[in-house]
Amino acid sequence: MRLLRRRHMPLRLAMVGCAFVLFLFLLHRDVSSREEATEKPWLKSLVSRKDHVLDLMLEAMNNLRDSMPKLQIRAPEAQQTLFSINQSCLPGFYTPAELKPFWERPPQDPNAPGADGKAFQKSKWTPLETQEKEEGYKKHCFNAFASDRISLQRSLGPDTRPPECVDQKFRRCPPLATTSVIIVFHNEAWSTLLRTVYSVLHTTPAILLKEIILVDDASTEEHLKEKLEQYVKQLQVVRVVRQEERKGLITARLLGASVAQAEVLTFLDAHCECFHGWLEPLLARIAEDKTVVVSPDIVTIDLNTFEFAKPVQRGRVHSRGNFDWSLTFGWETLPPHEKQRRKDETYPIKSPTFAGGLFSISKSYFEHIGTYDNQMEIWGGENVEMSFRVWQCGGQLEIIPCSVVGHVFRTKSPHTFPKGTSVIARNQVRLAEVWMDSYKKIFYRRNLQAAKMAQEKSFGDISERLQLREQLHCHNFSWYLHNVYPEMFVPDLTPTFYGAIKNLGTNQCLDVGENNRGGKPLIMYSCHGLGGNQYFEYTTQRDLRHNIAKQLCLHVSKGALGLGSCHFTGKNSQVPKDEEWELAQDQLIRNSGSGTCLTSQDKKPAMAPCNPSDPHQLWLFV
């Protein structure tokens, strides 16, 4: 049978050839025929018949073509990709010689103050030294005396990262992009600012470092003016740009980004030190996916001794970014599913939010995603806003554990803010109105200042940001909670009661006291109407929550009133009787487990046998 098919093959080819020649002849004649048909109506029917014949012939030719043996497999069609692949890059991996730092460190004295990242130590102080130290703390909120005596180019000792980080190789294709390092400062100490700069120069491969841009947010200190300009000229790739008016971190970073020339923007604070191999893992992840915003593993530089908390070879317990319903950024340990997903320290950590001080991002993606909200003022809320925006609009936030950068964490800011701290509330309202949908109500219940701004619409024009959300086809906030941060407890959108709990006997309000994260006694305090320590919710599950940040519940244990972590978490959980409360019409607040009622007798909240005639047991949500 196969032999017979092969013998007939030439005949089929000849038939196809003849049919094709006849088709060309008729097609040539067709042009003149159509022109004549328009003038001679009697020819129209013949032309239409010829069209039908041509259709039949074409169909026959297609059938013959399809019935012929497939002698050659076609090459697969090229698939479109989101980003073009660089065809000029070399195969293999970057060598240590290629990743040589921009500058080699000068010889180090191992006995120098703070050498190898060790703590600054001093046992004897003169009166002048003590005065200098105290003035440094007052001015910078860290030990500037110690910083000033540590080398600007100090080494941090050997590379102590886990072996998989030290041995990590980076592919040449796609190539690692160049980066512009942007450092914003305002009246920063000379030593911490310059140590940050030198740290970048000594740890960053020359082929990857395009420039270091120092953005001055209207500093008033003389050493940060002409002296700084002259000093950085010797550093080749360092330049200073300035905001003449104090506009804050957000605007300053936008200024730095606008003049940056590299493919990737890397933002650092002005009191950092970079560890071995900090940049390459960040750039490698962006080379894999330009929609990923990556942060280093941020470790502590002690604000008193400037000791650098070095990574350890066995790895450490990692944290990721979170937020609470007052829209404050925080840290939390990794959930089990994230620990299981990561095989070793080279695997990135998915993070619902990021600190926002230290990160790298593709410049083109930064612009695509909407940079920063340029109507936000000074500082505050911009990191949470960007976190929501990146995730909801198709990007990702990741922490790269093999990238380690130290940061001086201060307990308070040494700087004053134009317009006061109300700018933070205004920034938070802007992010809530654009990204949080109906969940913004949860925030407004906890921040009455923000709620008032929202009601009065005194937070500026957000039309451009809403248009950006629409243009990028971003997900809603419910999607974010379900897919990015399912561990987040979502309070009732409409709790049964909320606000301050006022006692009719004392005219004071129930208050959790300062810094009560659970375990401390509650107090009675003058009602201030600002929420905060006096904010409570009576939920549909019948628990009484103080949940500005942590979810804390009132409970009764051994007859005593207490405040602790809530047992109801929304999934496969229930409210225990000692946390369940009944708000009766007689204004008593009765605990279901003990059967006793909340009282303010002796101006201290406690439990007592229920007595509706006692005004100290009568409460009202206000």
UniProtKB/Swiss-Prot annotation:
Tell me its cofactors. Answer: Mn(2+)
Q: Name one GO cellular component term.
A: Golgi membrane
Q: Which UniProt keywords apply?
A: Disulfide bond, Glycoprotein, Glycosyltransferase, Golgi apparatus, Lectin, Manganese, Membrane, Metal-binding, Signal-anchor, Transferase, Transmembrane, Transmembrane helix
Note the InterPro entries from the entry: GalNAc-T (IPR045885), Glyco_trans_2-like (IPR001173), Nucleotide-diphossugar_trans (IPR029044), Ricin_B-like_lectins (IPR035992), Ricin_B_lectin (IPR000772)
Per UniProt, subcellular location reads as:
Golgi apparatus membrane
Lumenal domain ranges by topology: 29-622
Record domain Ricin B-type lectin: where: 506-622
Q: Which pathway does the UniProt entry assign to this protein?
A: Protein modification; protein glycosylation
Top-level enzyme category: transferase
List glycan-bearing residues.
N86, N476
EC number(s) per UniProt?
A: 2.4.1.41
Classification via SMART domains: RICIN
Location of region: Catalytic subdomain A: 176-285
Primary location group: Golgi
- UniProt topological domain (Cytoplasmic) ranges: 1-8
GO BP annotations, alphabetical order: O-glycan processing; protein O-linked glycosylation; protein O-linked glycosylation via threonine
Membrane topology value: Single-pass type II membrane protein
Q: Which GO terms describe its molecular function?
A: carbohydrate binding; metal ion binding; polypeptide N-acetylgalactosaminyltransferase activity
Q: Catalysed reaction per UniProt? A: L-seryl-[protein] + UDP-N-acetyl-alpha-D-galactosamine = a 3-O-[N-acetyl-alpha-D-galactosaminyl]-L-seryl-[protein] + UDP + H(+); L-threonyl-[protein] + UDP-N-acetyl-alpha-D-galactosamine = a 3-O-[N-acetyl-alpha-D-galactosaminyl]-L-threonyl-[protein] + UDP + H(+)
- Where Mn(2+) binds, per the record, is at D269, H271, H407
Q: What is known of its domains?
A: There are two conserved domains in the glycosyltransferase region: the N-terminal domain (domain A, also called GT1 motif), which is probably involved in manganese coordination and substrate binding and the C-terminal domain (domain B, also called Gal/GalNAc-T motif), which is probably involved in catalytic reaction and UDP-Gal binding.
What family does this belong to?
A: Belongs to the glycosyltransferase 2 family. GalNAc-T subfamily.
| Protein function | Catalyzes the initial reaction in O-linked oligosaccharide biosynthesis, the transfer of an N-acetyl-D-galactosamine residue to a serine or threonine residue on the protein receptor. May participate in synthesis of oncofetal fibronectin. Has activity toward MUC1A, MUC2, EA2 and fibronectin peptides. Glycosylates FGF23.
**Name of the molecule in the record:** Polypeptide N-acetylgalactosaminyltransferase 6
Which species does this protein come from? Homo sapiens (Human)
Q: What is the lineage of its organism?
A: Eukaryota, Metazoa, Chordata, Craniata, Vertebrata
Gene name tied to this protein: GALNT6
